[in-house]
Regions:
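C-terminal catalytic subdomain
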Residues: 1-2, 79-82, 150-220
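N-terminal entry segment of metal-dependent catalytic domains or homologous docking segments
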Residues: 1-64, 140-147, 196, 217-220
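PP2C/PPM family metal-dependent serine/threonine protein phosphatase catalytic domain
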Residues: 2-26, 78-86, 113-147, 151, ...
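Catalytic core of PPM/PP2C metal-dependent serine/threonine phosphatase domains
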Residues: 24-25, 54-123, 129, 143
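Short, well-ordered beta-strand micro-motif
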Residues: 30-32, 97, 202-204
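Short, solvent-exposed loop/turn segments that connect beta-strands within catalytic domains
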Residues: 35-39, 101-105, 209-213
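Residue-level marker for buried hydrophobic side chains located in beta-strands
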Residues: 44, 111, 156-158
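Active-site metal-binding loops of divalent metal-dependent hydrolases
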Residues: 47-49, 115, 161-162
């Protein structure tokens, strides 16, 4: 079952599934609410190398580090993670900050390793690139940051290489807008690949009609 978070009007869901049910998951996905704008959040996707307990140790070290420094600029935070994970086997990590603007919203993304991120707008997927490397193994400087605008109705997705990077998305279903966890579950069923853990995060940037619907149902 996906974990569900409401940050301002945005709905965020995360789903992490281990390769083997008896093992801890080596992927971690989290959303951290920040003080400031109506929607101001830091999103994390960490994929510990391999799977099993040692991969989980690396992923959870990433979660703890980000939780301790959520307002740090993304390049600095990535370098802090690189130091914090040196005692682990390392991880691929994606960091994304989403925030409200007068025009709608904006995202900033920094990734190292084979985590994937994209903005989904209507029928168009805008994929964001991660730079080569392993966090914990010496991250190359400077850490690149990419920015994109967000419009009402947009989606943001982050996922590990447990899902096919060539995944395609149909027209969004209304129930996904109400509960992005259903989208996470759909992606895990449809696009799982290889022998690896899965980590996926879905964030819906709502349209005004969606906000009205949620207000009527008490934020359901």
């Amino acid at each position: 079952m996906a974990d569900f978070t409401v940050i301002g009007p945005a709905h965020v869901a995360t789903l992490c599934l281990p390769l083997h049910a008896e093992e801890p998951c080596g992927d971690a996905a989290m959303a951290f609410a920040l003080d400031g704008a109506p929607v101001d959040a830091l999103l994390l996707l960490a994929d510990g190398l391999g799977h099993g307990p040692h991969a989980a140790q690396a992923a959870q070290a990433a979660v703890a580090t980000v939780a301790a420094h959520p307002t740090m600029p993304l390049p600095e935070l990535m370098l802090t993670l690189d130091e914090a994970l040196r005692h682990t086997r390392g991880a691929a990590i994606g960091l994304m900050r989403v925030e409200a603007t007068p025009q709608g919203g904006r995202l900033a993304f920094a990734g190292v390793g084979n985590t994937r991120a994209l903005r989904w707008r209507g029928a168009a997927l805008q994929r964001l690139a991660s730079q080569y490397g392993v966090v914990g193994g010496g991250v190359a400087r400077p850490v690149a940051v990419q920015t994109l605008d967000l419009l009402p109705g947009d989606w943001v997705l982050m996922f590990s290489d447990g899902l096919d990077e060539r995944l395609e998305l149909p027209a969004p279903l209304p129930e996904w807008q109400r509960d992005p966890g259903l989208l996470c579950a759909h992606l895990a069923r449809r696009w799982r690949q290889g022998a690896d853990d899965i980590g996926v995060l879905a964030c819906h940037w709502p349209a005004q009609a969606d906000l009205a619907d949620r207000a009527e149902c008490g934020g359901c």
